[in-house]
Regions:
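His/Asp/Glu-rich metal-coordinating catalytic cores
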Residues: 1-172
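A short, hydrophobic C-terminal helix/tail in secreted or cell-surface proteins
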Residues: 174-176
Length: 176
């Protein structure tokens, strides 16, 4: 196994691979510029252009333009809303709206998300703290990703989640 730094390069026999910073709901997404004897292939995986990512770097639009200007034999990409007109919202937009909602409501709020969306998890923690709420993570994947994100230096300035057993219906009912 080889660890590749963000914006790093790897040489694999006839393939020169350059990592390009992208944005998405997962941490540190990268596109790959793969230089082959036949030409350059750009592989992005799933990605989106988020002008205000809350975690991680902004998309390296300058480098993507340079690659396009140099010429690309093929682009292999995936983007969930590619056929939807307009732009998808930023995670910052989600944070502002969730903070507004949580500030107005007085009772229990349940926020659901993909466990892999650490920025969304961080948004939920932030909004809970700003509105004087507690937060709990439910599900093995949520706990696993939370722990991994903390170990990698993310989610460092968040409130501690409470044990999910402490948020049972009967426990909360007594406090409503």
């Amino acid at each position: 196994m080889q660890i590749v730094e963000l914006n790093g390069n790897v040489l694999l026999e006839d393939f020169e691979i350059e990592y390009i910073t992208l944005t998405h709901s997962i941490l540190e997404p990268n596109g790959l510029r793969i230089k082959t004897p036949a030409g350059v292939v750009l592989h992005t995986g799933d990605w989106k252009v988020d002008p205000n990512p809350l975690i991680g770097d902004e998309i390296n639009a300058k480098r993507l333009k340079e690659i396009g200007d140099e010429g690309v034999l093929a682009m292999i990409c995936d983007s969930t809303n590619v056929f939807s007109a307009g732009r998808s919202g930023s995670e910052l937009d989600v944070r502002k709206n969730l903070l507004n909602i949580m500030g107005r409501l007085k009772k229990r709020i349940i926020v659901t998300s993909f466990a892999s969306n650490v920025a969304r998890m961080e948004t939920a923690f932030y909004c809970a703290e700003q509105t004087g709420r507690q937060i709990s993570l439910v599900g093995r994947s949520m706990h696993r990703i939370y722990k991994a994100a903390r170990q990698c230096g993310y989610l460092q300035n968040t409130i501690d989640p409470i044990d999910p057993r402490a948020v049972s219906y009967t426990h909360l009912r007594a406090h409503e």
